């Protein structure tokens, strides 16, 4: 039995997301704001950090474009919209199989 090399993204799946420079800027900007009276507590985000994310929306007919909630190391998350699959900054990938 062969393992498929390509899996279609679906809502609720966990993926890895590689932060881009724009992502880091937006995360740092949000960190300076207060959410619901609670400050943001997290480890610093850096270009190229690979973080877990959950697929929150898929776009039919766009191949691998999805919206993601990226889990930061702390009490905050980041919404990454219309991101494609790949290995570059600002793209998501499937976690490696172990």
What residue spans do the PLM features occupy?
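Short, flexible, surface-exposed loop segments at domain boundaries
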Residues: 21, 43-44, 60, 65
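Intrinsically disordered, low-complexity, charged/polar segments
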Residues: 56-98
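Short, Lys/Arg- and Gly-enriched loop/turn segments at beta-strand edges
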Residues: 22-50
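Short, charged beta-turn/beta-strand-edge "cap" motif at the junction between a beta-strand
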Residues: 4-5, 14, 18-25
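Basic/polar N-terminal segments that are highly enriched at the extreme N-terminus
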Residues: 1-6, 31, 37-39, 96-98
């Amino acid at each position: 039995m062969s393992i498929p090399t390509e899996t279609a993204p679906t809502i609720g799946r966990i993926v890895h997301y590689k932060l881009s420079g724009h992502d880091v800027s937006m995360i740092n900007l949000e960190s300076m704001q207060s959410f619901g009276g609670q400050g943001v507590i997290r480890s610093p985000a850096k270009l190229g950090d690979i973080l877990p994310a959950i697929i929150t929306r898929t776009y039919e007919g766009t191949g691998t474009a999805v919206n993601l909630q990226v889990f930061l190391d702390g009490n905050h998350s980041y919404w990454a919209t219309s991101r494609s699959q790949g290995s570059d900054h600002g793209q998501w990938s499937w976690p490696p199989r172990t």
